[in-house]
């Protein structure tokens, strides 16, 4: 089994990485950061997001597993005191692969039709660079839906619906559903300006195209990466053809993750 371990970079996570690598030597597992079969994230959910983007070019060949060294994270299956058991499971069993939908974002520019493509595991958030009101036309399935005015828009995946989307009042969507969710960030609604004012859940075969009305620089935050874009003509969102693969060695149902992350106390776990 070829593996690689990515850490948060703090002393606790780095120490746990070295401990795991020593265990793995006993099982003759091969460290291979270029072509791993399994990527182990040690840290928090942010570390797993970084791991996802580092290996997003080979998603069909790699599976991810999270070990959390802080508070319980949403993508975590394992805690530090369980790593020896995890390594035994990796070595001795064929792991189950659970696939989650991803979000595809295509940025198109006014410069000769140039475009860039991104994948998001959690969400893509759009705001203006200078903090002014974002004014965009929202088109669904090729038809104009609304002109949005407000602080921004958040488009999330089902697994990402538990992150920023939840804080914005969006719905929680089970990741077995191939969908994306569009949630408003402080929209302007009065007698003159009007938006739908509710999160929109779109199925896989629907495309959302957003076109800036003004020529403001757009600040796009895709998961943990924030990039400013100039001369944006449109931003296209849809459920990606690719999926992220997680290695499962024991049951950890989605709704239990939600319960453990947002409802139960440490004493109840």
UniProtKB/Swiss-Prot annotation:
GO terms under biological process: NAD metabolic process; NADP biosynthetic process
EC class of the enzyme, as a word: transferase
SS bond partners: none
Active site positions: 45 (proton acceptor)
Location of this chain's protein in the cell: Cytoplasm
Pfam families: NAD_kinase, NAD_kinase_C
Cofactors, names only: a divalent metal cation
Catalytic activity: NAD(+) + ATP = ADP + NADP(+) + H(+)
Residues binding NAD(+), per UniProt: 45-46, 122-123, 149, 151, 186
UniProt cross-references to SUPFAM superfamilies, sorted A to Z: NAD kinase/diacylglycerol kinase-like
Annotated GO CC locations: cytoplasm
GO molecular function, one term: NAD binding
Domain of life where this protein originates: Bacteria
Catalytic activity, EC: 2.7.1.23
Keywords: ATP-binding, Cytoplasm, Kinase, NAD, NADP, Nucleotide-binding, Transferase
Xref: HAMAP family: NAD_kinase
PANTHER family on file: NAD KINASE (PTHR20275:SF0)
Function in brief: Involved in the regulation of the intracellular balance of NAD and NADP, and is a key enzyme in the biosynthesis of NADP. Catalyzes specifically the phosphorylation on 2'-hydroxyl of the adenosine moiety of NAD to yield NADP.
Family the entry assigns: Belongs to the NAD kinase family.
Protein name (record): NAD kinase
Name of encoding gene: nadK
């Amino acid at each position: 089994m070829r593996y690689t371990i990515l850490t948060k970079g703090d002393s606790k996570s780095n120490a746990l990485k070295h401990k795991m690598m020593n265990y793995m030597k006993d099982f003759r597992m091969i460290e291979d950061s270029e072509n791993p079969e399994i990527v182990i994230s040690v840290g928090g959910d942010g570390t797993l997001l970084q791991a996802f983007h580092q290996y997003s070019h080979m998603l069909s060949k790699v599976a991810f597993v999270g070990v959390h060294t802080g508070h319980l994270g949403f993508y975590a299956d394992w805690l530090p005191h369980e790593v020896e058991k995890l390594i035994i499971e990796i070595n001795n069993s064929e792991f189950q692969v659970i696939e989650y939908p991803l979000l595809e974002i295509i940025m198109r520019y006014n410069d000769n039709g140039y475009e860039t493509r991104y994948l998001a595991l959690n969400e893509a958030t759009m705001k203006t660079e200078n903090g002014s009101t974002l004014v965009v036309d929202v088109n669904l399935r090729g038809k104009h839906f609304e002109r949005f005015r407000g602080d921004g828009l958040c488009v999330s995946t089902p697994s990402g619906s538990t992150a920023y989307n939840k804080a914005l009042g969006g719905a929680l969507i089970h990741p077995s559903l191939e969908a994306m969710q569009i949630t408003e960030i402080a929209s302007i609604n009065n007698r003159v300006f009007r938006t739908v004012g509710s999160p929109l859940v779109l199925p896989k075969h629907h495309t959302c195209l957003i076109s800036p009305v003004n020529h403001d620089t757009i600040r796009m935050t895709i998961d943990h990466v924030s990039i400013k874009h100039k001369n944006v003509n449109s931003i296209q969102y849809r459920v990606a053809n690719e999926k992220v693969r997680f290695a499962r060695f024991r049951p950890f149902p989605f709704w239990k993750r939600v319960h453990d992350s947002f409802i139960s106390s440490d004493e109840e776990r």
